[in-house]
Amino acid sequence: MSFNHQEIEKKWQGYWEENKTFRTPDETEKPKFYALDMFPYPSGAGLHVGHPEGYTATDILSRMKRMQGYNVLHPMGWDAFGLPAEQYALDTGNSPAEFTEHNINTFRNQIKSLGFSYDWDREVNTTDPNYYKWTQWIFLKLFEKGLAYVDEVPVNWCPALGTVLANEEIIDGKSERGGHPVERRPMRQWMLKITAYGDRLLEDLDELDWPESLKDMQRNWIGRSEGAEVHFNIDGTDEKFTVFTTRPDTLFGASYCVLAPEHALVADITTADQKEAVEAYINSVKMKSDLERTELAKEKTGVFTGAYAVNPVNGEKLPIWIADYVLATYGTGAVMAVPAHDERDYEFASTFNLPMKEVVKGGDITKEAYTGDGAHVNSAFLDGLNKEEAIAKMIEWLEVTSAGNQKVTYRLRDWLFSRQRYWGEPIPVIHWEDGTMTAVKEEELPLVLPKTENIRPSGTGESPLANIDEWVNVVDPETGKKGRRETNTMPQWAGSCWYYLRYIDPNNSEALVDPEKVKQWLPVDIYIGGAEHAVLHLLYARFWHKVLYDIGVVPTKEPFQQLFNQGMILGENNEKMSKSKGNVVNPDDIVASHGADTLRLYEMFMGPLDASIAWSENGLDGARRFLDRVWRLFVQDNGELSEKITDAPNKDLEKAYHQTVKKVTEDYAELRFNTAISQMMVFINDAYKAETLPKEYVEGFVKMIAPVAPHIGEELWSKLGYNETITYASWPTFDESKLVEDEVEIVVQVMGKVRAKLTMSKDASKDEMEKLALEAIQDQIEGKTVRKVIVVPGKLVNVVAN
């Protein structure tokens, strides 16, 4: 008989809720363990089968750690601001707040139906004013430290929609919604100076237990480059511009310069006869995204400004071009071009027939750029030096002559922090009529997002908040000065940058987090989520954490000690699940048909946690069959405990049991859930063959399977006679001495060929081994004379006979 999953799951979920089984106490002598999931965005589509994969992994760890005597913090919450809710509100006229609340309730019910051991008293929601009060407080601290500033930044402006679009909302230069043209235009935006933390974000990666591939992604994103800044005067004017180069040693080989089309100097230096061509080119670039502009494979385009720069090292005049592959937002927005020794410059020079000058020996510049090392030539005081020596000498020359200086730059850009949206945290800043701006006072936080029926875009590029006059317009009560509130809102990243801190102290109205509690719980011991957040979310969260460390709010330099990315669950056809393909599997259906325990077991047994694997109905059925086998082994058809279970020991199962405890304990800790489950299956096979089942082993097994299948775990535990939940029962231990093999397999050879295999005591003497071996191969050596017997204790017997 199989078990009734609907009955059992409802019963134990009710028990856990009523008894607050998973409530995490703050004061405790126990060691701590903080297991964190990347909290979900509560979309209208609800939970899909990909969500529970990571959640089950942290839940297994949390449940094991509780049984091992740890005080476990395992929370859940909602990353609930964001574009889809605003889009829904625009399309339907409903409120994004109501939509979000409805979705959260759906998600919460779905998650509870899967039996995760979350402490729901610590639930957070980024759209709750009591939560975003502290998101705004962190912004004030960034503002005070000079890390939040206003800048003119090119954004994706869609005139037809009257709004700024995120890169993700644009497809082939047109708005995803309505297919309207999109152009780049500068707009006043809030920026966060993440670049000020570039070195620390890079160096501290070394101390983290993260996958190396993920650390490399962050290193590349930060993109630290050492080199020099070089100042170029513009011929015939007082103007100058600066370039950054990692190869100052090739300055003698510079043959032209390129400015970004948006560079502030372009309008001033363009000559009258080039003006028309330059303006036409600038207009054509407005439609392109940064990604399109910098694509390596694309055809090089550009136009000559008519102006010349002066090479500081030799006085040569270099033509100044503009080209879209140089971005105003990257570096200085200007580059010196050395086509003989840089691939991109070589392509551009070849396209526009610009001169090339070899300054490093070793290649053939008639065929391609030479980017390797070699002796310098045509370079005056650098001639004969290698790359490293020449770089050092050129930097020295630049600094002595004030023509430049040593410089470290980052690929990392400052973080564009404002959004022209309604559904986000208001930025707590007021712009006064005299041109000054001040932050909202701390005691006035939270600055609450006003309710409004009209969340249509303002049409001016400002957010819909600009339409709410009574909210936007303010008067200083002391001076009578008039002002306007900042109408931009924060991006969705803001609330997710620090949520792991709020779980530690979710109801504190006086502080972001209590200093004693944060000292107790940080760092997060394990953080599991999707690889799509490998760069931005993790980088932003690390940045905010370091700022909070600098102002004494948190005691650790890093938030997340260990990080793991789960793989993706694909459709049965190995394609990504999506509504359009009709291959999405809804966990609610599986919970109804097979049970939550089966879904949890199946997702952990599919393969390694970090692999992307196709969903399989057969695999799901197999997981259910295994749980049924476990149930039938321990429970009779009448619901009573099996009569095979006794208090007497059973030597036959001893080794298998201790092996299972060892392997499951180690594999759970290392997130190798699929191999832990395999080992439990092996044990169940052995247990079916056994005459009797020692109660100690049955209890140990139930404790091991409970983290994966908690409902069946609780039900079996109560059938074993326990009135208390299994949650805090002590984890089983193993005895190493019981794992040692008493018997070994001996190979028997005749004239070097294997003729038999024997099992015997590992302590058998040479004589005993020889005697047993000769008996086993009697028919092989009949009529032959045994000349010699070679015995290797514990391994083999080789008989020489002819």
UniProtKB/Swiss-Prot annotation:
Q: Per its UniProt record, what CDD domains does this chain match?
A: Anticodon_Ia_Leu_BEm (cd07958), LeuRS_core (cd00812)
Q: Which organism is it from?
A: Bacillus anthracis
Q: Where is this motif: 'KMSKS' region?
A: 576-580
Question: Which gene specifies this protein's sequence?
Answer: leuS
Motif 'HIGH' region is found at: 40-51
A molecular function GO annotation: aminoacyl-tRNA deacylase activity
Q: Identify the keywords attached in UniProt to this record, alphabetized.
A: Aminoacyl-tRNA synthetase, ATP-binding, Cytoplasm, Ligase, Nucleotide-binding, Protein biosynthesis
Give the family from UniProt: Belongs to the class-I aminoacyl-tRNA synthetase family.
Localisation per UniProt entry: Cytoplasm
Biological processes annotated in GO: leucyl-tRNA aminoacylation
User: What Enzyme Commission number does this protein have?
Assistant: 6.1.1.4
Indicate which residues the UniProt annotation says bind ATP.
Answer: K579
Protein name per UniProt = Leucine--tRNA ligase
Superkingdom of source: Bacteria
State the reactions this protein catalyses.
tRNA(Leu) + L-leucine + ATP = L-leucyl-tRNA(Leu) + AMP + diphosphate
Keyword check for Aminoacyl-tRNA synthetase, yes or no: yes
Signal peptide stretch: none
Broad class of enzyme this protein falls into: ligase
Q: Which InterPro entries match?
A: aa-tRNA-synth_I_CS, aa-tRNA-synth_Ia, Leu-tRNA-ligase, Leu_tRNA-synth_edit, M/V/L/I-tRNA-synth_anticd-bd, Methionyl/Leucyl_tRNA_Synth, Rossmann-like_a/b/a_fold, tRNAsynth_Ia_anticodon-bd
The GO cellular component terms are:
cytosol
- Pfam families per UniProt: Anticodon_1, tRNA-synt_1, tRNA-synt_1_2, tRNA-synt_1g
